[in-house]
């Protein structure tokens, strides 16, 4: 799973979700964060 921080989501291949990834643990936190492209 590749996650890229972005400002907006305009690509149909991706779904925009509000999430962050803890850089130390790699744990995804869906409750807080910046918009990202996430492969679905």
UniProtKB/Swiss-Prot annotation:
- The question of whether Magnesium is a record keyword is answered with no
Give its E.C. classification number.
1.7.-.-
PTM: Ubiquitinated by PRKN during mitophagy, leading to its degradation and enhancement of mitophagy. Deubiquitinated by USP30.
Q: In which tissues is it expressed?
A: Expressed in the liver (at protein level).
Keyword match Ubl conjugation: yes
Superkingdom in the source lineage: Eukaryota
**What cofactor is this protein dependent on?**
Mo-molybdopterin
The reaction(s) this protein catalyses: N(omega)-hydroxy-L-arginine + 2 Fe(II)-[cytochrome b5] + 2 H(+) = L-arginine + 2 Fe(III)-[cytochrome b5] + H2O
Quick one: where is this thing mainly located?
other
Q: How does it sit in the membrane?
A: Peripheral membrane protein
Name the Gene Ontology molecular function terms of this record.
oxidoreductase activity
Cofactor binding: number and manner? Binds 1 Mo-molybdopterin (Mo-MPT) cofactor per subunit.
Q: Which GO terms describe its cellular component?
A: mitochondrial outer membrane; peroxisome
> Which keywords does the record carry?
Isopeptide bond, Membrane, Mitochondrion, Mitochondrion outer membrane, Molybdenum, Oxidoreductase, Peroxisome, Ubl conjugation
Q: Where in the chain is the Glycyl lysine isopeptide (Lys-Gly) (interchain with G-Cter in ubiquitin) cross-link?
A: 10, 31
What is the annotated role of this protein in its UniProt record? Catalyzes the reduction of N-oxygenated molecules, acting as a counterpart of cytochrome P450 and flavin-containing monooxygenases in metabolic cycles. As a component of prodrug-converting system, reduces a multitude of N-hydroxylated prodrugs particularly amidoximes, leading to increased drug bioavailability. May be involved in mitochondrial N(omega)-hydroxy-L-arginine (NOHA) reduction, regulating endogenous nitric oxide levels and biosynthesis.
Subunit field text: Component of a complex composed of cytochrome b5, NADH-cytochrome b5 reductase (CYB5R3) and MTARC2.
Protein name per the record: Mitochondrial amidoxime reducing component 2
Species this protein is from: Sus scrofa (Pig)
Q: In the UniProt record, what gene is named as encoding this protein?
A: MTARC2
